[in-house]
Regions:
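Basic, Lys/Arg-enriched C-terminal extension of HTH/homeodomain DNA-binding domains
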Residues: 191-242
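C-terminal output helix
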Residues: 96-98, 112, 116-126, 175
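Acidic, metal-coordinating helix/loop segments flanking the phosphotransfer/catalytic sites
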Residues: 42-60
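Conserved acidic segment of CheY-like receiver
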Residues: 12-25, 29-33, 46, 61, ...
Length: 242
């Protein structure tokens, strides 16, 4: 069974935000999405969209490049400035290669020139939703792991850090000045609290915690990087488990 660190579920069905200054185009795209079972919210200006809070559900943005009083590429940069990683499908009747390249380099999922086929549009939106779903799941899983790690005692964190670094129970006992039996107890408790079915799972969880915040499981100082014995890392340990 693959390693699945997260337990949370998505909060709602996906939503597609549509920003086009042509009301008829907005309505047509909304109807198309509705026919495919997708929810949508439409806006006729960049300002109207940018003043709207983005929900917690998986979502994407269908954005016209040339809006009245605004440039779709500028909207893309503004979202990035705000830290909003919303996948974007650009649509335009005036696209050129330079504009397409600029949008894609900035992270756009697709760039569609009007007129486009209905299925082409739906495929692009589905891909964008999938991208956002993956990102949100990664965040959710990271939050879940951090919450579990926070329940460990200082000693359990200490033992976990040394164990995933490759030290045997006897070595850990000598390192922290306790008996080997005590190490086994703390290691078992750490695995239960982390919901790790196997030690390999615990190693993979340590890798995920490292990626999110390396100092989370440093046993000496919460502000410094973790120390691993003999050059061993959680990544190399995980590789040995396949």
């Amino acid at each position: 069974m693959p390693f699945m660190p997260c337990r949370g579920r998505e909060r709602a069905d996906p939503v597609v935000y549509i920003v086009d200054d042509d009301p008829d185009m907005n309505d047509a795209l909304a109807d198309l999405l509705d026919s495919a079972g997708m929810r949508s919210k439409s806006y006729v200006s960049a300002d109207a969209f940018l003043s709207t809070p983005i929900g917690e559900e998986p979502s994407c943005l269908v954005l016209d490049v040339r809006l009245r009083g605004a440039n779709g590429l500028d909207v893309q940069q503004e979202l990035k400035r705000r830290g909003i990683a919303l996948p974007i499908v650009f649509i335009t009747g005036y696209g050129d290669i330079e504009m397409t390249v600029q949008a894609m380099k900035a992270g756009a999922v697709d760039f569609l020139a009007k007129p486009f086929r209905d299925q082409t549009f739906l495929d692009a939106v589905s891909q964008a939703i999938a991208v956002d779903r993956t990102k949100r799941r990664a965040v959710r899983c990271g939050d879940d792991l951090r919450a579990r790690f926070a329940t460990l005692t200082e000693r359990e964190r200490e033992v976990m850090t040394l164990a995933v670094a490759g030290l045997m129970n006897k070595q850990i006992a000598g390192e922290i000045g306790v008996s080997e039996v005590t190490v086994k107890i703390h290691r078992g408790r750490a695995m239960r609290k982390m919901s790790a079915r196997t030690f390999a799972d615990l190693v993979k969880m340590a890798i995920e915690l490292d990626r999110a915040a390396p100092a989370l499981h440093d046993r000496r100082d919460q502000s410094s990087a973790p120390r691993y014995a003999g050059g061993t890392t959680p990544q190399s340990m995980a590789a040995s488990y396949g």
